[in-house]
Each structure stands twice: as C-alpha cells, then as structure tokens.
C-alpha cells in the first residue's frame, strides 16, 4: 500500500491546548493547529518537530492540520482522519476483486468496512509503543471495547470479522495496552479465541507517502 500525502510545511510543537487543538511554531510564528486524534499522544511533546498540512477551508480557526510528529528517527503519522483511507487501500490488496463497503451497521455499532457482505472490519490506529512493543489504546476507550464486542457478536451471528490495526511507529510486535485499559485488553484476547481475525500492519510516513511495509505479529502476553 502506498498513498501520497505530502506535508506542506514543518513546525515545532509547543503545547496541546485542548483535545483537538495545539500550538506550534510555524514559519516563525506561534500558530493554532488542529489535532485530529482523541488519544493522549504521549509522544507529542514540546520541542518536537511536526509535519503539517494547510487547512482546506480558510474559515477555520486552525489554519493547519497536524499530520505527524517526530519520534526518534522517524515521523509518526497521527492524523486519525486518514485511517479509513489507509485501511481501505490495504483491504483492496488483502481482498482483491472483493466488494468493499464502508460504514456498515451491525446491531448497535457501525463498523468501518464490510467485505463481500460477509466480513465486518474495524480499524484502529496505534501511535504508542514501549520497548519495541506497539500498544493500543493510549487512553481508556469504551467505544473501542464495544466495537470488539460487536465483532465477537457478528461472528456468533455467522459473519466473519477482522480487527485491522495500523501501527504508525517502529515496533517489533503488538499488544493491547493492559495497564491503560484492562477491559479492552480482556475483550481483545476474548476476540482472538472467539474467531475474530486480527491483522497488524506497520505503516510508515516520510512526509510524502504513507506506506504499509510489513505485517507485525501479536506479542506473547507476559
């Protein structure tokens, strides 16, 4: 998978003002930027280089969208608004020739995709790691837990189900973040035992392209 998404400029992150806004030094000026990610994003720290895209509308209070933040030797893509686009491209490669529909409802949830009317797909983006282990979530997520429970329910109803996890930073393998959200971790392992397929893909960003480079394994839980 390769998706062109060039950043328009680079800045220096200064602070997070609220859930969706932050301040960065852009072209020598303190500028309000939009953060399209509801996670805690612990890697978003003062002084980090960030990649930004100019907002399409000049009516917005925030003139720039945050795309990626510097972390070690790479830029980590953090704009969750592109998760479905990236996932859709990956699914086209995983299921060539299949009918892929987006935003399909099952019981009390709306899943990201439905493939050939028989496989529900939910997508999660991961921007957190510890000691080479990618972890999701970085903040408690009742919504995320509910989505996985509904995937389990869809399998019991005769459908197939896939949890597609996109890991945006260098990692060796993936685990649910038990210390941050024990309930999510429990339902993750229950989903595996219940027949939900879980695929984890590493996605890199170089300021120009988003590329899916490899499939990651699920770590052994300690």
Curated annotation (Swiss-Prot):
InterPro entries for this protein: SfsA (IPR005224), SfsA_C (IPR040452), SfsA_N (IPR041465)
Molecular-function annotations in GO: DNA binding
Transmembrane parts of this sequence: none
Domain of life where this protein originates: Bacteria
Family: Belongs to the SfsA family.
NCBIfam families noted in UniProt: sfsA
HAMAP family hit by this protein: SfsA (MF_00095)
Protein name: Sugar fermentation stimulation protein homolog
Gene name per UniProt: sfsA
């Amino acid at each position: 998978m390769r998706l062109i998404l060039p950043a328009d400029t680079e800045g220096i992150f200064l602070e997070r003002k609220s859930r969706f806004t932050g301040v960065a030094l852009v072209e020598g000026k303190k500028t309000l930027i939009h953060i399209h990610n509801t996670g805690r994003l612990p890697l978003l720290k003062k002084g980090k280089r960030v990649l930004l895209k100019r907002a399409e509308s000049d009516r917005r209070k925030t003139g720039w969208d945050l795309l990626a933040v510097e972390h070690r030797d790479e830029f980590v893509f953090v704009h969750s608004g592109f998760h479905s686009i990236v996932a859709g491209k990956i699914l086209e490669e995983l299921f060539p020739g299949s009918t892929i529909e987006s935003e399909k409802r099952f019981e009390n949830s709306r899943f990201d995709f439905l493939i050939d009317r028989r496989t529900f797909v939910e997508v999660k983006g991961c921007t957190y790691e510890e000691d080479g282990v990618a972890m999701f979530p970085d903040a408690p997520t009742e919504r995320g837990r509910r989505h996985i429970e509904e995937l389990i329910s869809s399998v019991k109803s005769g459908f197939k189900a896939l949890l597609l996890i996109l890991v945006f930073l260098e990692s060796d393998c993936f685990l649910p973040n038990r210390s941050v959200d024990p309930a999510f971790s429990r339902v993750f392992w229950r989903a595996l035992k219940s027949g939900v397929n879980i695929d984890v893909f590493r996605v890199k960003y170089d300021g120009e392209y988003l590329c899916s480079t490899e499939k990651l394994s699920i770590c052994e839980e300690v």
